[in-house]
Design a protein with these regions (language model features):
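Conserved P-loop
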Residues: 2-63, 67
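Short, basic/glycine-rich phosphate-binding loops at helix/coil junctions
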Residues: 1, 54, 75, 81
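A short, structure-level motif marking secondary-structure boundaries and short turns
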Residues: 6, 86-87
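The start of beta-strands in P-loop NTPase/AAA+ ATPase cores
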Residues: 30, 83-84
Length: 120
């Protein structure tokens, strides 16, 4: 499953991304949430408001300040115990980087929030 949430800045992409993550968390699927936002701590309470429970067992937020940092941790995430990989704030991926990231997911669910349009 690959879901790309696209839109302009301020159109609620991250909120929609969190809503989809909450749906998976309610199903007791493990979610890793990789973001460029330093204030990601608040996302846990948002997920709980959306009905997600047991976050300490199923939810792992991670901060990577830029694309290079994200690509460095991507192999670690890909081999971790996660059912869903959510990416927030990495809108400068080109098609090749996007394709590489998809290969690293090992056929897990991927949700990307971005203002970028991809050809795949």
């Amino acid at each position: 499953m690959y879901v790309v949430i696209s839109g302009e800045k301020g159109e609620g992409k991250t909120t929609e991304l969190l809503r989809l993550c909450a749906t998976h968390l309610k199903e007791k699927k493990t979610v890793v949430f990789l973001t460029t936002r330093e204030d990601y701590d608040g996302f846990a309470s948002t997920l709980e408001e959306m009905g997600a429970k047991d976050l300490k067992h199923y939810y792992r937020p991670m901060y990577a300040k830029d694309l290079q940092s994200a690509m460095e941790v991507a192999p670690i995430i890909a081999h971790g115990p996660y059912d869903v990989i959510a990416l927030d704030g990495y809108s400068k991926l080109d098609d090749k980087q996007y394709e590489e990231l998809m290969k690293l997911t090992n056929e897990r669910g991927v949700i990307i929030s971005t203002s970028q349009k991809y050809s795949n």
